Amino acid sequence: VPISSSESVWTSRIDEHWHDALQSLTRPLEVVDLFPRSILKGELPTPLLEELLALGTKVLKNPESNPDASLKLAGQLSQQRELRPNQPGVQPLIEDHLLPGCERWIRHVIDRQPPQGRGPWVQGRYHLKLIDLWLNCQIAGDYNPTHTHGGSFSGVIFLKTPPQITANSFDGQLCFHGPEEWHLQSFRTGMAHYVLPVPGEFYIFPAWQPHSVMPFRGDGERWSLAFNATAIPGPPRAQAMGNISLSNQRPMVQGF
């Protein structure tokens, strides 16, 4: 319906009034963002990134040397191979970056609550345990549909990307999905957040956070590591010595 001249003047005056009122406020207005979803971002030191790249090269040259993870993962990727805890770079990655990152996420979220509202997640009353870790090799046309994970935490570590994956398109990007659909007319614009894969950067997020990976076009491979971890109330229990499978007693597997 066309706006009449009188309605146009009235709307213009209201807009001017609101603008002037905002400029003359003696007490500032505050916008409160409700129900935040926290995602932790970090970066690996260069020597560790290089060690993991060398491990990825070795694994992909002889894929059968590591268990195939694709049968229990959601991704439609060229290769998905489980990594063992005794392989080069795996323990430093877990102990110095992934589990500390999960701990940082817990403290960021839980310490906002009053002490009586923190349940079992008080420091010293729980422990973190890695469930599994695997290598993803994505080529043109491969993708990962929207999915979640089992356990408490999941995450991705970017190792290598082809040059055509850039911020100019969504190709090859990781996407975090919100709980509602995107709808610009009603100001719902933050329901999908895309992350450009940068080698050495990693992201940790709650396992229930829906996410996906877009396909890309052209030559080259996109390498990443992914993991699942769980937070367990109670003090840590002593573990048997020797090599321990990161996949034993896996409660639920969905994939990255």
State where each predicted segment sits.
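N-terminal acidic, proline/glycine-rich, low-complexity intrinsically disordered segments
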Residues: 1-6
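Non-heme Fe(II)/2-oxoglutarate
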Residues: 7-123, 141-143
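Karyopherin-beta/Importin-beta family HEAT-repeat alpha-solenoid scaffold
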Residues: 27-30, 212-214, 246
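Short beta-strand micro-motifs in enzyme catalytic cores
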Residues: 38-40, 221-225
